[in-house]
Design a protein with these regions (language model features):
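Long, C-terminal-biased catalytic regions of enzyme "large/alpha" subunits
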Residues: 1-85, 92
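Short leucine-rich amphipathic alpha-helices used at interfaces
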Residues: 2, 7-9, 13-16, 207-208, ...
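N-terminal alpha-helical segment
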Residues: 19, 37-40, 174, 222, ...
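Residues that form generic nucleotide/phosphate-binding pockets
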Residues: 26, 47, 64, 158, ...
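Intrinsically disordered, low-complexity Ser/Thr/Pro/Gly-rich regulatory segments
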Residues: 34, 61, 65-224, 241-242
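Short linear loop/turn motifs
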Residues: 40-44, 115, 207-210, 253-257, ...
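Compact, charge-rich alpha-helical regulatory domains located at protein termini
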Residues: 216-278
Length: 278
């Protein structure tokens, strides 16, 4: 690779110097072995050219991982798989609800609740014996799009209107926490604002906060979206999403869903094998 700095183009159109450590980190975080990571990094850096896009780099890394460590490739593609839950955003709400279920909460989606002044439609309501959480699930289906200060302010105002109301979820109670969950990033001003709001605005982005981000939660819970699978095509995934099915593990627990797609037994076996390898 040329010793001169090489600039790559990010998904938002901005240019930055290629950082080999970012590529290494993303591969290792997905679970790639040191040997595979070193091999992929070497292959990509040898072919790197000025102006190459992050999408090009990701695609090549995914192809190499798919060959060397297929289950790792599925984890590496996680961010894009979440984006494929769209475009409506409703499957993302279901997906966020599944994360809360894993954490021991009961959940409902698409709830209309009465605030002090107006009614609000809440994407996810989650509760257990200890707390009641209401969630705004902000879905973006394009890389490079961030949730900005305007979104954070809007969501905080909604939670403020709900803060003194009594709700019946499990028992009569008031709202304990308001969450803003997005599948991409927050702008720096949104993060600065949110950092001063306490439990009134808990902000969860793809890689924010440093510990406990959406990506961390997904890996901890092993709740891989069915959109990460390579053994199903786009039409088949869309059919399942329209039925409210968002998780790989649901397809193993309910094999009749795959039968309902009209898949032959050989394909069903391949899908199941791919899921179990995750």
């Amino acid at each position: 690779m040329n010793t001169e700095p090489i600039y790559i183009v990010k998904s938002d159109g901005t240019r930055e110097i290629f950082d080999i450590k970012k590529l290494e980190f993303s591969l290792k975080r997905a679970g790639a072995s040191s040997a595979v990571t070193d091999g992929i990094v070497s292959t990509i850096t040898d072919s790197l050219t000025d102006g190459m896009t992050t999408h090009d780099i990701y695609t090549r890394a995914f192809e190499l991982l798919h060959t060397d460590e297929h289950p790792v490739a599925l984890k590496y593609s996680l961010k894009r798989a979440i984006m494929e839950l769209g475009p409506s955003g409703f499957p993302f709400e279901d997906y966020v609800a599944e994360i809360f279920k894993y954490k021991g909460f009961e959940t409902l989606t698409g709830q209309v609740v009465k605030g002090k002044f107006v009614e609000h439609e809440i994407d996810v309501v989650a509760w257990n014996d200890e707390k009641l959480i209401m969630v705004e699930a902000k879905f973006h289906n394009q890389l490079g799009v961030k949730s900005d200060l305007k979104i954070a302010l809007y969501v905080k105002e909604r939670f403020d209107d709900l803060s003194e109301q009594t709700f019946h979820y499990g028992k009569d109670r008031k709202l304990d926490e308001g969450w803003l969950v997005t599948n991409t990033k927050f702008t720096t001003t949104a993060i600065e604002y949110g950092s001063h709001q306490g439990k009134r605005l808990v902000m969860i982005g793809w890689n924010y906060p440093e510990h406990g981000s959406l990506h961390d939660m997904i890996l901890e819970a092993k709740l891989h979206p069915l959109t990460c699978l390579t053994t199903l095509d786009g039409r088949q995934k869309k059919t399942l999403l329209e039925q409210g099915i968002v998780l790989c593990k649901t397809l193993v627990e309910r094999p009749e869903l795959l039968v309902g797609l009209g898949l032959p037994s050989e394909t069903i076996a391949k899908v199941t094998e791919e899921i179990q390898a995750l």
